[in-house]
Amino acid sequence: MKLLFVCLGNICRSPAAENIMNAQIDQAGLGAKIVCDSAGTSSYHVGDSPDRRMTESLKKRGYRVQGRARQFFPEDFAEFDLILAMDGDNYRNILAQDPAGQYHHKVKMICDYTEKFGDREVPDPYYGGQAGFEHVIDLLEDACGNLLTSLGKELVN
């Protein structure tokens, strides 16, 4: 199973989701069955490391942070089993790269997997303060945990 997390620039939300999910996958012993990556719908930050503020926030919670920003491309539809958008704008931008709708069934909103929060989108913390980064991590921990539970059931069946 291959998962792709997607936000705008691939320096805050989607790399956070990728690194949180990787930690949860490792903890569940599913590293051989689930592979994660992340991308951005824009090319603003291609090649950059994750945002320093997000990296610091993740490390404070014990996460290992790795990865470099890359852009989402139409080839990703065939490469990944599930593509998880952080917000509605990115969801629509992803779908726009598949005009025939062949892969629309693979694209979901990450917040569809949250249970503890009412948020329908993961807000972009880039221009906000520290509390915004913490809220994003809280949302993603919840969503990734529930997603992993769902995938674990699929992988067993």
Curated annotation (Swiss-Prot):
Active site residues according to the UniProt entry: 7, 13, 124
Keyword presence, Cytoplasm: no
Disulfide bridge map: none
InterPro entries membership: LMW-PTP (IPR052995), Ptyr_pPase (IPR023485), Ptyr_pPase_sf (IPR036196), Tyr_phospatase_low_mol_wt (IPR017867)
UniProt keywords, alphabetically: Hydrolase, Protein phosphatase
Top-tier EC class: hydrolase
Protein origin, superkingdom: Bacteria
Alphabetized GO MF terms: protein tyrosine phosphatase activity
EC assignment: 3.1.3.48
Record field: catalytic activity: O-phospho-L-tyrosyl-[protein] + H2O = L-tyrosyl-[protein] + phosphate
A family per Pfam: LMWPc
Protein family membership: Belongs to the low molecular weight phosphotyrosine protein phosphatase family.
PANTHER family per record: ACID PHOSPHATASE (PTHR47439:SF1), LOW MOLECULAR WEIGHT PHOSPHOTYROSINE PROTEIN PHOSPHATASE-RELATED (PTHR47439)
Identification of the protein by name: Putative low molecular weight protein-tyrosine-phosphatase slr0328
Protein source organism: Synechocystis sp. (strain ATCC 27184 / PCC 6803 / Kazusa)
